[in-house]
């Protein structure tokens, strides 16, 4: 994948860059693997905003991606690399030998015609899914399960990879992209390699319109609001916060305050917190 930049014809194109989509081999999705996804616009079941600054954007079909990789021992060939509007990573369309079709996250370096397989005795190759205890130390992995059989929950973003750093007893220790070091049960599955589309982080949207196209609405600063709307609001002109530190719109400490519950059971599995 490459990145295309534009000449400064307009203020929007001056800073903008886009993917060249050279890695895409199939323009339309597999119809049987798509479903309609309702745009909730950041609202819950009562219509109350629970996630601010969301709404609008282009309509999308959801691609049903196989995060479980539970078709053990059945080889599959990569039939196409496709665009997915719901994530930065590309997805790979697999044709299994028994006729089934599935999508997976496309690892970096995978191409049309590559054969992949999942299972305990799978060969050690990019795109294959194995239990963590079968994966050698130092290997880059992605789409990692936290609970065996539940499907991959960690390390799924474009360009992301975790590293296997230790094995001891029933647990395998991983270094995550955030530099957090944590233990995961050894029977949990992970996929060999790094998630593809590694250049996604370098793309610049360039203008507000492209951000709106993604379904993100303007993020208004609290300091320009009224006191009734935000703890930072009010005052004459540009006023300081007027509190011991910056606050969220609901009056809780922001910017640096730790939010993780200390009583969380999984805290004992975290060897080193993220930086």
Curated annotation (Swiss-Prot):
Keyword field contains Nucleus: no
Biased composition annotated in UniProt, kind: Basic residues: 259-275
GO CC entries: large ribosomal subunit
Functional description taken from the UniProt entry: One of the primary rRNA binding proteins. Required for association of the 30S and 50S subunits to form the 70S ribosome, for tRNA binding and peptide bond formation. It has been suggested to have peptidyltransferase activity; this is somewhat controversial. Makes several contacts with the 16S rRNA in the 70S ribosome.
Transmembrane residue ranges: none
PROSITE patterns the UniProt entry points to: RIBOSOMAL_L2
Gene3D superfamilies cross-referenced by the UniProt entry: 2.30.30.30, Nucleic acid-binding proteins, Ribosomal protein L2, domain 3
Keyword rRNA-binding in record: yes
One Gene Ontology MF term: transferase activity
Xref: Pfam families: Ribosomal_L2, Ribosomal_L2_C
Subunit structure: Part of the 50S ribosomal subunit. Forms a bridge to the 30S subunit in the 70S ribosome.
Keywords, alphabetical: Ribonucleoprotein, Ribosomal protein, RNA-binding, rRNA-binding
HAMAP family: Ribosomal_uL2_B
Region (Disordered) location: 1-55, 218-275
Name this protein carries in UniProt: Large ribosomal subunit protein uL2
Domain of life of the organism encoding this protein: Bacteria
Record InterPro entries: NA-bd_OB-fold, Rib_uL2_dom2, Ribosomal_uL2, Ribosomal_uL2_bac/org-type, Ribosomal_uL2_C, Ribosomal_uL2_CS, Ribosomal_uL2_dom3, Ribosomal_uL2_RNA-bd_dom
Protein family per UniProt: Belongs to the universal ribosomal protein uL2 family.
GO BP: translation
């Amino acid at each position: 994948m490459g990145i295309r930049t534009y000449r400064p014809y307009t203020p929007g194109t001056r800073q903008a860059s886009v993917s060249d989509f050279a890695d895409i081999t199939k323009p339309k999705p597999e119809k049987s693997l798509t479903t309609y996804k309702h745009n909730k616009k950041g609202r819950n079941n009562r219509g109350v905003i629970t996630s601010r600054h969301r709404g609008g954007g282009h309509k999308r079909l959801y691609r049903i991606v196989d995060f479980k990789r539970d078709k053990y021992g059945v080889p599959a060939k990569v039939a196409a690399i496709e665009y997915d509007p719901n994530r930065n990573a590309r997805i790979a369309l697999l044709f299994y030998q028994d006729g089934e079709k599935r999508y997976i996250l496309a690892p970096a370096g995978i191409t049309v015609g590559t054969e992949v397989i999942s299972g305990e005795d799978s060969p050690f190759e990019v795109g294959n899914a194995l239990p963590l205890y079968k994966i050698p130390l130092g290997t880059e992995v992605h789409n990692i399960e936290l609970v065996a059989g539940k499907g991959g929950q960690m390390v799924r973003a474009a360009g992301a990879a975790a590293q296997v750093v230790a094995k001891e007893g029933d647990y395998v220790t991983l270094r995550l992209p955030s530099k957090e070091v944590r233990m995961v049960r050894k029977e949990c599955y992970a996929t060999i390699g790094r998630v593809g589309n590694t250049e996604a982080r370098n793309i610049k949207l360039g203008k507000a319109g492209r951000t709106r196209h993604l379904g993100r609405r303007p993020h208004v600063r609290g300091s320009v609001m009224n006191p009734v709307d935000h703890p930072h609001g009010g005052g004459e002109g540009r006023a300081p916060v007027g509190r011991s530190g910056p606050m969220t719109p609901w009056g809780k400490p922001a910017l640096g305050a730790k939010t993780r519950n200390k009583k969380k059971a999984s805290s004992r599995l975290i060897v080193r917190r993220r930086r």
